[in-house]
């Protein structure tokens, strides 16, 4: 067993979503980076958008930590490896500190990382202290560093908030309410980093605001135990995988792409919006993103639509997740009612909704093996296709996402986390496999019968069927 490693670390959490966790985490990352420190940032739970912002802020890749989807050992490995190179580790929580199972608090407690509570101080005075006390004392064994007030109006306002804290609660400072440092959002969350031309200006402004009003010394070092290291097998040696990546398709986990490379795959990125043909590839990966914002442009690229149809007709592997699946349908209609005809490999149509349609962790038993991931979308899909499998939410949700298969094409609303089962992922992308697996029926029963141990942790809202 390798020795443990030590690195200053803190987990940034809040009483609820929308309190400004990402803004504060990004500001801290940019501040310490500007001071010459190497900062590694992680995000609790499934998320694609926050990590884009945090990568720009820190200048380093951002990975997920999660006790169920990622797993304890993989989370331990990521932290242990980061501790070898970083001067500071920041972990942004998800939802409220104690929300969900697993929660941000579960992760902080398990790895001994102290929590910095971020509380939106808007229209609040003494109640701030009550909220801070609740965060600190609700679970007595939770390491708690202190609190930081966000969106504070004036210096006097900040003094009122600080004065409301009970003895023993540490005040880290206050971040003012400035539009120049807030991060804009849309229906799936924050606007993608690549779409914000002034993002670096916002991050530097937030870092400067923190430096002038908050305590920014490094937190105490945390001991991170060494994991059990398992080397990836070269199951995809020499396999060329074309990966869609542009403003319509950008929702990929860094750990998933790392795994494909570690198994020997060669990744070739392309744009379904701008490119007219696919790269020379054995397999195709269409991840999620915002196809609904670009569906007209996607529909107008007839050459790319034909290239994807030809890839499938040649019997080559194709994996499509969420937005990637919508792209493969006959049509996609946005919230304004504008309809665009797309690839047409999956018979059906999707319509965007103004409200959230599904949010949940998912465990899926495919013919290739069990995979874990999550679902999060604002569309509803109508199709007569028969699924080969349905996901199960680990907390026993009232619905589950379907997985569809036509030949070597696999499509679902589920965003799969590839390291949850490298062998199954390799089978999805490897060319030349027997196609008999495509016709296997969906398994029945609960997570135990599907080979996925019933976790003591689950998460999220129940998913709705497509």
What are these regions (language model features)?
Residues 239-313:
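Phosphate-binding active sites in nucleotide-utilizing proteins
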Residues 125-233:
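Internal gly/pro-rich beta-alpha loop/helix module
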Residues 113, 169, 313-317:
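A short helix->loop->beta-strand "cap" motif at the edges of active sites that frequently abuts
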Residues 182-230, 234-238, 349-434:
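Amide-donor transfer/coupling interface in amidating biosynthetic enzymes
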Residues 441-442, 463:
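Short, low-complexity intrinsically disordered segments enriched in A/P/G/S/L with frequent Arg
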Residues 2-111, 119-142, 155-159:
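ATP-dependent carboxylate-amine ligase catalytic core
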Residues 267, 291-365:
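Cysteine-nucleophile active-site neighborhood
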């Amino acid at each position: 067993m390798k020795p443990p490693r030590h690195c200053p670390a803190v987990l940034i959490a809040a009483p609820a979503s929308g309190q400004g966790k990402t803004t504060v985490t990004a500001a801290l990352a940019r501040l310490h980076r500007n001071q010459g420190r190497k900062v590694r940032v992680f995000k609790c739970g499934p998320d694609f958008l926050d990590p884009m912002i945090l990568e720009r802020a820190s200048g380093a890749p951002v990975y997920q930590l999660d006790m169920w989807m990622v797993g304890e050992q993989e989370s331990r490995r990521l932290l242990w490896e980061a501790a070898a190179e970083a001067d500071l580790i920041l972990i942004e929580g998800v939802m409220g500190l104690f929300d969900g199972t697993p929660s941000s608090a579960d992760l902080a407690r398990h790895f001994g990382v102290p929590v910095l509570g971020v509380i939106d101080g808007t229209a609040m005075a003494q109640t701030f202290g009550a909220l801070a006390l609740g965060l600190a004392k609700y679970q007595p064994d939770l390491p708690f560093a202190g609190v930081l007030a966000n969106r504070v109006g004036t210096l006097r306002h900040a003094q009122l908030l600080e004065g409301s804290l009970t003895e023993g609660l540490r005040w880290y400072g206050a971040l003012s309410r400035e539009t120049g440092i807030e991060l804009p959002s849309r229906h799936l969350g924050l606007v993608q980093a690549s779409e914000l031309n002034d993002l670096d200006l916002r991050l530097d402004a937030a870092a400067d605001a923190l430096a002038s009003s908050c305590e920014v010394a490094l937190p105490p070092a945390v001991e991170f135990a060494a994991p059990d290291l398992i080397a990836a097998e070269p199951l995809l040696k020499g396999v060329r995988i074309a990966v869609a990546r542009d403003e319509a398709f950008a929702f990929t986990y860094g750990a998933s792409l790392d795994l494909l490379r570690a198994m020997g795959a060669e990744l070739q990125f392309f744009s379904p919006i701008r490119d007219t043909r696919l790269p020379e590839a054995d397999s195709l990966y269409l991840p999620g993103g915002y196809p609904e914002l670009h569906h007209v442009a996607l529909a107008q690229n007839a050459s790319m639509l034909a290239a994807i149809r030809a890839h499938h007709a040649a019997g080559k592997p194709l994996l499509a997740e969420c937005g990637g699946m919508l792209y493969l349908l006959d049509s996609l209609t946005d919230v304004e009612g504008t309809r665009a005809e797309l690839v047409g490999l999956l018979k059906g149509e999707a319509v965007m909704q103004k409200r959230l349609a599904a949010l949940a962790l998912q465990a899926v038993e495919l013919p290739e093996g069990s995979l874990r991931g999550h679902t999060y979308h604002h569309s509803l899909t109508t199709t007569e296709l028969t699924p080969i499998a349905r996901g199960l939410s680990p907390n026993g949700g009232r619905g589950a996402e379907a997985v569809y298969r036509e030949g070597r094409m696999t499509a679902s609303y589920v965003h799969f986390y590839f390291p949850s089962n490298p062998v199954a992922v390799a089978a999805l992308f490897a060319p030349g496999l027997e196609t008999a697996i495509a016709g296997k029926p969906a398994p029945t029963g609960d997570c135990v019968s599907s080979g996925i141990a019933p976790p003591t942790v689950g998460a999220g809202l129940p998913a709705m069927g497509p």
